[in-house]
Every structure is written in structure tokens, then in C-alpha cells.
Amino acid sequence: MNPIILIIILMTVMLGTIIVMISTHWLLIWIGFEMNMLAIIPIMMKKHNPRATEASTKYFLTQSTASMLLMMAIIINLMFSGQWTVMKLFNPMASMLMTMALAMKLGMAPFHFWVPEVTQGIPLSSGLILLTWQKLAPMSVLYQILPSINLDLILTLSILSITIGGWGGLNQTQLRKIMAYSSIAHMGWMTAVLLYNPTMTLLNLIIYIIMTSTMFTLFMANSTTTTLSLSHTWNKAPIMTILVLITLLSMGGLPPLSGFMPKWMIIQEMTKNDSIILPTLMAITALLNLYFYMRLTYSTALTMFPSTNNMKMKWQFPTTKRMTLLPTMTVLSTMLLPLTPILSILE
């Protein structure tokens, strides 16, 4: 793709998200979502192959359905309140439709079906945008309609997402699908605490974006998309492999890494609000995620897959790809846990 065209498309994606985040009018929010969706489809189809085309079509269909639901919720709200301003939704039906439309855009269960398929069909760089930047707009709208969200509905969606995000990733060997299921689980954690402490949701979102960006950058640097190709990176770049493994464990929420901090704070927040069974269930289900990350780490670090002698010589050659931000991102995605006492002011 022509670099100028790519820059224009990326700017449109960013503009769409920014319009959604700063608007106080429902129609502008809807327009922002549409701009964002139509601009990201060419980015997904950068590589002209049938898989990318299929993934883009799936993405387009699900996002269009979510946009229609969103517009329907906006119109129902308009009928009851008589205004377009973004504020408390007066009608429970409008609130439910809006929550479901945003859950569909975020890829939360039971509307998660498109996330693994789409992420698997597109290049790593497009997958990075899909699983990080694309979460900002729907999350900001959820944040704005907080007072009118149905607690039972949002907690059901979050528990389903955490469970499916854990179970779905168990039998995967494709790294992009593992990242997609991880994204579903993380969305579940974020929305679970949304009504108790929205600032905690933002903290979780920031840490999730940092960890996912680091992960995808490392995958792009090593050109790895499967467990097998990840196991061969020992021969190509031993230090890079160690970084991949530590970041993977951080994504699984293993203490004392960064990924443990949001989980710890969310469980603490929910316990403070006299919710005991729910955080217990969430913590148990999070072990599924940790299990498939541990298994990936084990298969890469402690088992030797068959490889040729030529492959074993690759460590001698310097890496040609420049990754300026990688050291900073790796530190942020693994070493933020000591900052937890400072962040306790978020409460």
C-alpha cells in the first residue's frame, strides 16, 4: 500500500475514535464509529489474500450489526427523552440495546465469535490496531453512559467473556488467536469493575494496551505466528525470546509482573463492594488464561522442537529490524507492580 494513502487511512481511523471520545451528541458518536469502521477495513486488507478478505467481511458485517443496534438504541432514547445529548439513558430497553451494541464492538462474549477469526485472517500490524486502538471508542461510550447500565447485564457479559476467553484459548496453537481470546478475557475484567470503579477500568485498559502492543511488536520483530515458529526464536534471538516469554506471563496475570496489578486491584475493589462470589469466580477462571500462557512458555523455553543445523546458526546474525520503543514497552509491561501503592489513590 502507498505510504501516503496508509497515513491518510490511519489518520481517519484515529479521527473516528477521537470524534466518538469527545462528542456529546449521539449522531456524532455514531458517525465516528462508522468512519472508524470504514477506514480500518483497507488496513486489514493490506495483504490481498482470500483470508484477509474474509476477515474484513466478517468484521464489516458484525460492526454494521452493532452500529444498527446502536442507532436503534439512540432512536428509542430520543423518543423517550426528546434530546440527542449524551447523558443518562431514560429507557431500560435503550440502555440494554446500547450495552449489547458496545459489547459487540468490543468483542465480548456472547458476541465474541468474530474476534479470533478476524485477528487470525489479518496481518500482525492490523491485528495490533484491532485489539488495542479499536477498544478505545466503545469503552469511552460505556464510560459516558455509566449511570444507566444494567448491573446484572454487564456482570453477566463480563463473566461470560472471562470464561470464554480462558476456555477458547486452551486448544490454540496460533498466536494471533491466543491474543484474541486473551483480549476477550481482558474485556471481561474491565467491564466487571466498570460500575464499581470506572477509573480502575481505565487503568486496566491502559495496562492491557501496553502489554498487547509489546506482544505484537515482539511477534512482528520475530515474524512468529504459531507456537512452532515461536519455539524456533531461541536460535534466532535468545534475548527476544526471553522478553516474549516474560510478557506472555505478564498477560496471564502472574505475580510479580504488571499484568497482576489490575487483577489484584479489581478483586480488591469488588470485595470492598461486598461482592465475594463474583471475584472468586473471576480469579478461578483467570487461571485458564494463565494455564495456556504457561504452556506456551513451557513449550518454547523448556522443550526443543526439531530444527535444522542451519537454523541453529541464526543467532550469529544481527537483527535488521529497528524497534525503538521496545525496551520501554517491555519494562512497562513487566515491572509496573511496585507502583500499586501509588495507584491506590484511584479509589
From Swiss-Prot:
Gene Ontology MF terms: NADH dehydrogenase (ubiquinone) activity
GO biological process, one term: reactive oxygen species metabolic process
Record bears the keyword NAD: yes
This protein's UniProt keywords: Electron transport, Membrane, Mitochondrion, Mitochondrion inner membrane, NAD, Respiratory chain, Translocase, Transmembrane, Transmembrane helix, Transport, Ubiquinone
Reactions catalysed: a ubiquinone + NADH + 5 H(+)(in) = a ubiquinol + NAD(+) + 4 H(+)(out)
Keyword Transferase annotated: no
Domain of life: Eukaryota
PANTHER family associated with the record: NADH-UBIQUINONE OXIDOREDUCTASE CHAIN 2 (PTHR46552:SF1)
Record text on subunit structure and interactions: Core subunit of respiratory chain NADH dehydrogenase (Complex I) which is composed of 45 different subunits. Interacts with TMEM242.
Name this polypeptide is given: NADH-ubiquinone oxidoreductase chain 2
Organism, scientific name: Ovis aries (Sheep)
Gene label: MT-ND2
